[in-house]
């Protein structure tokens, strides 16, 4: 009976130990486990949130990079257009200036040609008059001389 009594005593002690553990030891252990579980869940949630934020940031960076490349391409295209436009304007200005210089040179040549013709007319008229005087061996007065020169210049 000693063994049975010992077993009953051990069972009672075990029961008291279990009640004591359930009352004083088990709640802090369960609370610690729940806190740890909550920390892990919060950490996982924060990691998921950070992953989503990272994906959004990567998408935003990719979008900004595409926009920057597009803007750069537009700026380069505008610069090329402006360069071509400036080149065409310079060509037009050079062409206009060349035409103006050619026109001015032609006008100057015409003026020189007319001056040379007038000079030659005057010289030819003077020579013709001198020749006529020698032939006639008479002198013509200044008024008649001027009239003859004008008529001769008009005929030439």
Curated annotation (Swiss-Prot):
Signal peptide residue numbers: none
Superkingdom assignment: Bacteria
Any matching Pfam family: ATP-synt_B
Membrane topology: Single-pass membrane protein
Assigned keywords, A-Z: ATP synthesis, Cell inner membrane, Cell membrane, CF(0), Hydrogen ion transport, Ion transport, Membrane, Transmembrane, Transmembrane helix, Transport
Main location class: membrane
GO MF annotation list: proton-transporting ATP synthase activity, rotational mechanism; proton-transporting ATPase activity, rotational mechanism
GO annotations of cellular component type: plasma membrane; proton-transporting ATP synthase complex
Subcellular locations according to the entry: Cell inner membrane
TM segment ranges: 5-25
NCBIfam families for this protein: ATP_synt_b (TIGR01144), PRK05759.1-2 (NF004411), PRK05759.1-4 (NF004413)
Role summary: F(1)F(0) ATP synthase produces ATP from ADP in the presence of a proton or sodium gradient. F-type ATPases consist of two structural domains, F(1) containing the extramembraneous catalytic core and F(0) containing the membrane proton channel, linked together by a central stalk and a peripheral stalk. During catalysis, ATP synthesis in the catalytic domain of F(1) is coupled via a rotary mechanism of the central stalk subunits to proton translocation.
Protein family according to the UniProt entry: Belongs to the ATPase B chain family.
Subunit (UniProt): F-type ATPases have 2 components, F(1) - the catalytic core - and F(0) - the membrane proton channel. F(1) has five subunits: alpha(3), beta(3), gamma(1), delta(1), epsilon(1). F(0) has three main subunits: a(1), b(2) and c(10-14). The alpha and beta chains form an alternating ring which encloses part of the gamma chain. F(1) is attached to F(0) by a central stalk formed by the gamma and epsilon chains, while a peripheral stalk is formed by the delta and b chains.
UniProt cross-references to PANTHER family, sorted A to Z: ATP SYNTHASE SUBUNIT B (PTHR33445:SF1), ATP SYNTHASE SUBUNIT B', CHLOROPLASTIC (PTHR33445)
Protein name, as recorded: ATP synthase subunit b
Source organism per UniProt: Hahella chejuensis (strain KCTC 2396)
